[in-house]
């Protein structure tokens, strides 16, 4: 009797247990941004139509349903209008049915808005990947809200304005998708509740995936009918690489054969084949590589054929290579090449040094060889106009040496020996002409302006006028070049003071320097091989090599310079 009563009690308990059983399962995480609307759904909702109750998990306090509260329950949804950072926590939802209670937990985290455009990963929804030419992105969680169009879209925090971006309902359509369209896309919409509008934003990444394709195998290595050099007794490695398209490939493989026999059946332990490994080529093609390794090359290996095979569902391709003995390096030839290059480099360095030291001599020699009879059609009458300080009453003794240098030394060398035409003030006289006009015309018709600089030159008014005209022609009009000859006296006290010269003349002295004439330094004052005359000839134009008679007579002709005694 007692056993029957116990059995009845157990049966009653088993029958009534489902009425009071509560199933605790299901948990989910959700997040939102501060001062935005956040609506979450009970994880245990499913298709149930039974009422849902929400609780604060830490206090078991029931969350009200009145809409006047900032946090309230609406059917199976929990609304935060707006959400705040202190709302973060775990919330429990209970679905009560006549036979079973289901409890779910929701971990809600409210974050502050990022100060910059860089959105952290924990605020990103699932990444969207697309490969179609035209693609659409869905705004996440928008179906939970009471929103009205339009939805605003942003890419990397910048509003989308191009016509190929089209917003329709909760979607963003992108036409002609390219890799430039990859990035973070944010949708922004408005949730309306009790006459108040709340902003909601959601961000997800978009990446472009190109569609894969399969093609006939293409062997990229080794080349067709290639011959590889190896050393006897040394190890050797040969790679067989082939590309099959993009994406996953079914039944694609690369392998080696030796004399039309697979490596595993060839029977040589020295020769092993590594399994194919996946690689990507420079154009993003999917490729496979298999490496044939020979631990020690023998003479027998040189007579074998090695086939690189690539095959897939499209077909098979084969590249055959052979091995040959590597020729030893001819060290003697290398020594000869290194020695020859070293000698050539030394010769070039010596040549550069010689040219730098003897550049003027080389240039003068080149003139004599290459242009011995050069003619000019520039319309100039003279090769040089000589500008020098005149003799006047009370002049220093050095003035007379300048006069002798200008009227005797210069013509003897430059006119009689070199064939130049000089225009020298005071050498010839054509009366009845205006002095200033004739000086200016003579300077304009000269290819060089030779300044003879002396310590007493500042006392010569004629020198100052000619200097002005000549510098204007050389520096302003770029009509001629200037040669500066400095007369060095024997005493140190009467040297030329450059600071006393005109600014333009000081500039020329600083830039190109002067050619110094000192009588005690020159043994043969008219020798063309002296350093002074080499420098003068180098700066003079290339002379016309007319007959010596013509060269001497030229200064005495009607085109010679004028005697401007009363300048």
From Swiss-Prot:
GO terms for biological process: inflammatory response; macrophage differentiation; negative regulation of canonical NF-kappaB signal transduction; negative regulation of T-helper 1 type immune response; negative regulation of type II interferon production; positive regulation of chemokine production; positive regulation of inflammatory response; positive regulation of interleukin-5 production. It is an enzyme of class 3 (hydrolase). Changing residue 192 to V: In strain: C3H/He. It comes from Mus musculus (Mouse). Residues 380-540 form the TIR domain. The gene is Il1rl1. Interacts with MYD88, IRAK1, IRAK4, and TRAF6. Bound to its ligand IL33, interacts with IL1RAP to form the minimal interleukin-33 signaling complex with a 1:1:1 stoichiometry. Interacts with KIT (bound to KITLG/SCF). A mast cell-specific KITLG/SCF-induced interleukin-33 signaling complex contains IL1RL1, IL1RAP, KIT and MYD88. Interacts with TMED1. Disulfide bonds join 42-93, 117-157, 139-187, 240-308, 243-287. This is Interleukin-1 receptor-like 1. One of its GO terms (molecular function) is interleukin-33 receptor activity. Glycans are attached at residues 60, 101, 107, 146, 176, 194, 225, 259, 278. The modification Phosphoserine is found at residue 442. Residues 27-332 are extracellular. Keywords: Cell membrane, Disulfide bond, Glycoprotein, Hydrolase, Immunoglobulin domain, Isopeptide bond, Membrane, NAD, Phosphoprotein, Receptor, Repeat, Secreted, Signal, Transmembrane, Transmembrane helix, Ubl conjugation. There is a cross-link at residue 326 (Glycyl lysine isopeptide (Lys-Gly) (interchain with G-Cter in ubiquitin)). Belongs to the interleukin-1 receptor family. Predominantly expressed in hematopoietic tissues, and in macrophage, erythroid, epithelial and fibroblast cell lines. Isoform A is expressed in brain astrocytes and microglia. Isoform B is expressed in brain endothelial cells. The TIR domain mediates NAD(+) hydrolase (NADase) activity. Self-association of TIR domains is required for NADase activity. It is found in: Cell membrane. Phosphorylated by GSK3B at Ser-442; leading to proteasomal degradation. Its EC number is 3.2.2.6. It holds the Pfam family ig. It is a single-pass type I membrane protein. GO terms for cellular component: cytosol; external side of plasma membrane; extracellular matrix; extracellular region; focal adhesion; membrane. Residues 1-26 form the signal peptide. Disruption phenotype: In response to cardiotoxin-induced muscle injury, mutant mice show impaired inflammation resolution characterized by deficient muscle fiber regeneration and impaired clearance of necrotic cells.
């Amino acid at each position: 009797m007692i056993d029957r009563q116990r059995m009845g009690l157990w049966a009653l308990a088993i029958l009534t247990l489902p009425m009071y059983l509560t199933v605790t399962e299901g948990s989910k995480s959700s997040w939102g941004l501060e001062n935005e609307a956040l609506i979450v759904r009970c994880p245990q909702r499913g298709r149930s139509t039974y009422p849902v109750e929400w609780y604060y998990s830490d206090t078991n306090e029931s969350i009200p349903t009145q809409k006047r509260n900032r946090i309230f329950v609406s059917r199976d949804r929990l609304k935060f209008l707006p959400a705040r950072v202190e709302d973060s926590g775990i919330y429990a939802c209970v679905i009560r049915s006549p036979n079973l209670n289901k409890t779910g937990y929701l971990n809600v985290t409210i974050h502050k808005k990022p100060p910059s455009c860089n959105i952290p990963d924990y605020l990103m929804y699932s990444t969207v990947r697309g490969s179609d030419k035209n693609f659409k992105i869905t705004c996440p969680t928008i179906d939970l809200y009471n929103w009205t169009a339009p939805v605003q879209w942003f890419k990397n925090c910048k509003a989308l304005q191009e016509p190929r971006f089209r917003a329709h309902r909760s979607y963003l359509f992108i036409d002609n998708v390219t890799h430039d369209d990859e990035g973070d896309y944010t949708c922004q919409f408005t949730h309306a509740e009790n006459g108040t509008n709340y902003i909601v934003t959601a961000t997800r990444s978009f990446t472009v995936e190109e569609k894969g394709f399969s093609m006939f195998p293409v062997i990229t290595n080794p080349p067709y009918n290639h011959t590889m050099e190896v050393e006897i007794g040394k190890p050797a490695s040969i790679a067989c690489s082939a590309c099959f398209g993009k994406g996953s490939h079914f039944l694609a493989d690369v392998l080696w054969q030796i004399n039309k026999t697979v490596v595993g059946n060839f029977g040589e332990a020295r020769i092993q084949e590594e399994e194919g490994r996946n690689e990507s080529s420079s154009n993003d093609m999917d490729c496979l590589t298999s490496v044939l390794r020979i631990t020690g090359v023998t003479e027998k290996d040189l007579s074998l054929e090695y086939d690189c095979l690539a095959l897939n569902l499209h077909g098979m391709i084969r590249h055959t290579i052979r091995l040959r003995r590597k020729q030893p390096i001819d060290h003697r030839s290398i020594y000869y090449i290194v020695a020859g290059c070293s000698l050539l480099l030394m010769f070039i360095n010596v040549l550069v040094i010689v040219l730098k030291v003897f550049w003027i001599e080389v240039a003068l020699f080149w003139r004599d060889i290459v242009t011995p009879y050069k003619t000019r059609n520039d319309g100039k009458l003279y090769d040089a106009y000589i500008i020098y300080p005149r003799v006047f009453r009370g002049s220093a003794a050095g003035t007379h040496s300048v006069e002798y240098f200008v009227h005797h030394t210069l013509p003897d060398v430059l006119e009689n020996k070199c064939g130049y035409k000089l225009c020298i003030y005071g050498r010839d006289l054509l009366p009845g002409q205006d002095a200033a006009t004739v000086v200016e015309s003579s300077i304009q018709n000269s290819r060089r302006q030779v300044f003879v600089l002396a310590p007493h030159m500042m006392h010569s008014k004629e020198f100052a006028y000619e200097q002005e005209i000549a510098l204007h022609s050389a520096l302003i009009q770029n009509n001629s070049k200037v040669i500066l000859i400095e007369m060095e006296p024997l005493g140190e006290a009467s040297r030329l003071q450059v600071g006393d010269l005109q600014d333009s003349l000081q500039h020329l002295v600083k830039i190109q320097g002067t050619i110094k004439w000192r009588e005690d330094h020159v043994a043969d004052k008219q020798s063309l091989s002296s350093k002074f005359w080499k420098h003068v000839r180098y700066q003079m134009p290339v002379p016309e090599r007319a007959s010596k008679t013509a060269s001497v007579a030229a200064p005495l002709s009607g085109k010679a310079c004028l005697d401007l005694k009363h300048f």
